[in-house]
Curated annotation (Swiss-Prot):
Function (record text): Sigma factors are initiation factors that promote the attachment of RNA polymerase to specific initiation sites and are then released. This sigma factor is responsible for the expression of the nitrogen fixation genes. The open complex (sigma-54 and core RNA polymerase) serves as the receptor for receipt of the melting signal from the remotely bound activator protein NifA for the expression of the nitrogen fixation proteins.
Sequence motif RPON box, residues: 453-461
Family to which the UniProt record says this protein belongs: Belongs to the sigma-54 factor family.
Cellular component, GO annotation: DNA-directed RNA polymerase complex
This protein's name: RNA polymerase sigma-54 factor
Organism: Acidithiobacillus ferridurans
Length: 475
């Protein structure tokens, strides 16, 4: 085998730490970016945050040498958009927050109201606070504590009274007596052992508890909850001996109740979203700008930058920190430019949505925007994830505007988002006693030139949180 040397000329892209940092910054949310910026400010003395009243943030001296590896970013690594989160819905809680029982003891035994209201607390914390305000004997207080610990996040008693009584070696009747008092706590319905009891507790706490409609609602919840779930209204009227008007009034009361009262007491802190982009109407045109509140304002510390010219270890450290700071600022600016460019392309393609609503949403995939801004699809994917725009129609994540398409008779296409909007509009306008089935909705859409299978209608209906026809039927 003959050995030899061969010289080849070629180019390749090295994934430098700076390039990795730029890619990572691009896919961070605004909240995460603020944490990243704060960490960089704490670790790099060459970076300062502009506060708005400082005038020393000008360019650093010309004699300072910049890093030689500055080059155009290529953000072409593959990244797949996360699936949309499923839509979840709950009944609205119509009750005001209150307290039950009467206090006993000295002022120093009372709970700290200010600290209780100034922090997020769990359901158990809230119930213990009410127990502290209730007159219990020492044994009753221990039983109340056991019951509260056994209440799950929905507000239901997760363990049987028999098991709880065996745990404390107390009589089940004594434990039941304490449970009934805990069930008077807020939120209404807490401590229930099943759905029927939960709803009954809420009905019994209504001001008009002796009203005929409330009493009828109690009968339904206690003895006929399954029939109500099946929407068997004729049978309910017959069994209860009431007319449709009375049944309708009782059902309105029941539908206003909360089947999961424990979830009204916050167990998690509120997650805030800072919009990256602001979209507004300027006459008949849409204007898209970066949100100044979301843009980090950084500058180079001039005092330390002037010390970067030496060659000893201390000066080399300062020069390395200066190079890192310059690259970080450059990456932030590149991130902002990319977000704005993608946002403007989205708004331009979906301008009919902003003018007319979701029914006018156009089909759009990553390729459409990537071609418009002359970037790789993976770059657009990173930009659309966890980035938000505040618009005249509300707050939207960038990826909301991307959806698949369905063919039309005219040879065009309709956005899946627009079809969901049409579906919601049809179900809202339907006859309540004869709601549209999925097959009927498919036929109505076909009459409008949109060819869609019944199974696809069912998928879009579920995504829009619209129940099936059997559950939408009302009196």
């Amino acid at each position: 085998m003959k050995q030899g040397l061969e010289l080849k000329l070629g180019q390749h892209l090295a994934m430098t730490p700076q390039l990795q940092q730029a890619i990572r910054l691009l896919q961070l949310s605004t909240v995460d970016l603020q944490q990243e910026v704060q960490g960089m400010l704490e670790s790099n003395p060459l970076l300062d945050e502009e506060t708005g009243d400082e005038g020393g943030g000008g360019p650093i001296p010309e004699t300072v040498e910049l890093p030689s590896e500055e080059r155009q970013l290529d953000l072409a690594a593959e990244n797949i958009l996360p699936d949309e989160l499923p839509v979840d819905s709950q009944w609205d809680d119509i009750f005001d927050m209150g307290t039950s029982g009467s206090g006993n003891g000295s002022d120093e035994d009372l709970p700290d109201f200010e600290s209780r209201n100034s922090r997020t607390q769990s359901l158990q914390d809230y119930l213990r606070w009410q127990a502290d305000m209730t007159h219990f004997t020492a044994d009753e207080r221990n039983m109340a504590e056991l019951i509260i610990d056994a209440i799950d996040e929905r507000g239901y008693l997760a363990d049987s009274l028999e098991d709880l009584a065996a745990t404390m070696n107390v009589q089940e009747d004594a434990l039941l007596a304490v449970l009934l008092r805990v069930q008077d706590f807020d939120p209404p319905g807490v401590g229930a052992r099943n759905l029927s009891e939960c709803l009954l507790l809420q009905l019994k706490q209504m001001v008009e508890k002796d009203d005929a409609h409330v009493l009828l609602a109690q009968r339904i919840v206690k003895d006929h909850l399954q029939a109500l779930g099946r929407h068997d209204y004729p049978r309910l009227c017959t069994v209860l001996g009431v007319d449709e008007a009375a049944l309708r009034a009782a059902m309105a009361l029941i539908s206003a109740l909360n089947p999961k009262p424990g979830e009204d007491v916050g167990t998690e802190s509120t997650e805030y979203v800072i919009p990256d982009v602001i979209v507004r109407w300027a006459g008949s045109r849409l204007r898209t700008d970066l949100n100044p509140e979301a843009m980090p304002k950084l500058r180079i510390n001039r005092h330390y930058a002037d010390m970067a010219g030496g060659k000893d270890a201390a000066h080399k450290y300062i020069q390395d920190q200066l190079n890192e700071a310059r690259w970080f600022i450059k990456s932030l600016q590149s991130r902002q430019d990319t977000i704005l460019k993608v946002a403007r392309a989205i708004v331009e393609r979906q301008k009919d949505f902003f003018a007319n609503g979701p029914e006018s949403m156009r089909p759009m995939v990553l390729r459409h925007i990537a071609d418009a801004v002359e970037m790789h699809e993976s770059t657009v994917s990173r930009v659309t994830n966890q980035k938000y725009m505040i618009t005249p129609r509300g707050l939207y994540e960038f990826k909301y505007f991307f959806s698949s398409h369905v063919g039309t008779d005219s040879g065009g296409s309709a956005s899946a988002t627009a079809i969901r909007a049409l579906l919601i509009k049809m179900t809202q306008a339907e006859d309540a006693q004869h709601p549209l089935s999925d097959a009927e909705i498919a036929r109505v859409l076909a009459d409008q030139g949109i060819q869609i299978a019944r199974r696809t209608v069912a998928k879009y209906r579920e995504a829009a949180n619209v129940p099936p026809a059997s559950q939408r039927r009302r009196l």
